[in-house]
Amino acid sequence: MKKVLVVICAILLFTGCSCSLNDTKPEEAVETFFEKYRAKDDDIITQLKDTIENEDLTDDAKEKYQELMEKQYDQFAYVIKDVKEENDEATATVELTVLNYKSAILKTEEELKANPEKFNDEEGNFSEEKYMDYKIEKMQEVTDTTTHTIELSLNKENGMWKVNQLSSDDISKLHGLY
């Protein structure tokens, strides 16, 4: 599931980097970048749905994944701590506070190790569906948060600042999976 969410998040982040007409400062581009997620921009949600639809999950699991991601978008917070600008390049240090989905994933993995039979089907075989349902259930219960610091790189193109592609670690941090 972590891989699924990272892929979903990566696609959304790559397309969420577009700038607005007002991004004449790096700070404004960073705000635009994060606010697209908080506002659940139509493009972001459409791409989220398209990405989830292509995953090998039950319809119920797909719906719950989308809800988890939207919950993260609703609840994450960010603070721009510092911006260093040099010519047409900038680096923004941002502190993110996100729902700690990683804690639920770790608990699910521990449960699998301790009680593997819990995830067996009627024939005694491991059921990926049961495991994923349990993992999603645990992620839905998450209320604790975690804080990470990420470094965003930006480039100035035609007078407008644009956030560059995030690293996979930063993508995981943004989505509470790190």
Positions of the model-derived regions?
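Core segments of small alpha/beta cavity-forming domains
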Residues: 20-80
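Hydrophobic beta-strand residues in large extracellular and virion-surface proteins
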Residues: 30, 78-80, 94, 152-154, ...
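Short glycine-rich, low-complexity/disordered patches
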Residues: 47-52, 128-132, 147-152
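Surface-exposed, charged secondary-structure patches
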Residues: 63-137, 173-178
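Short beta-strand edge/turn micro-motifs at domain boundaries
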Residues: 114-126, 140-178
